[in-house]
Amino acid sequence: MHYPEPISKLIDSFMKLPGIGPKTAARLAFHVLAMKEDTVLEFAKALVDVKRHIHYCTICGHITDTDPCYICKDERRDRTMICVVQDPKDVIAMEKMKEYNGLYHVLHGAISPMEGIGPEDIKIAELLARLQDETIQEVILATDPNIEGEATAMYLSRLLKPTGIKITRIAHGLPVGGDLEYADEVTLSKALEGRREL
């Protein structure tokens, strides 16, 4: 199908998003075309603003518009615990259950030899630097319960064991092969309660 160039460009842009194929991209493009101009401009501004103003916290790696992020700044949080997650979306999922009150460390990925991602490609060095703080007593490994997440948890467990810090892994109330961001609060809560030392 031949579309006018601006629509083709918009369809191509939507297709760059994960899970958006040509049909969905075309549907979205035509929806945008039918929207009021001020709504489209507001949408475009939101896209630009998120790219310009959202960055990663220099301490934990979570998404933020301030530095440090609101979690790292919060003096009421338990500074003896760090929960290690793969992505910022996992921090949001953990925070929704309102039961964990410690700090976080976002790895921004997981070890995946098949994809050429090794320990040096994710934020492990930054985690080790944070663990030099002697107030840390427990590291909770909350990587996804899939092959990459398990490999990352095992690697971190072996790497951190000599530090003497208690290393725990969230329990598997989560489906194997699933992602933390899709788990409901009850499942996440049970998984956190049932974490075990590695």
Swiss-Prot record:
Residues 80-175 form the Toprim domain. CDD domains: TOPRIM_recR (cd01025). It comes from the Bacteria. May play a role in DNA repair. It seems to be involved in an RecBC-independent recombinational process of DNA repair. It may act with RecF and RecO. Pfam families: RecR_C, RecR_HhH, RecR_ZnF, Toprim_4. Belongs to the RecR family. A zinc finger (C4-type) spans 57-72. This is Recombination protein RecR. InterPro entries: DNA_Rcmb_RecR (IPR000093), Rcmb_RecR (IPR023627), Rcmb_RecR_Znf (IPR015967), TOPRIM_dom (IPR006171), TOPRIM_RecR (IPR034137). GO terms for molecular function: DNA binding; zinc ion binding. The keyword Ribonucleoprotein does not apply. GO terms for biological process: DNA recombination; DNA repair. Keywords: DNA damage, DNA recombination, DNA repair, Metal-binding, Zinc, Zinc-finger.
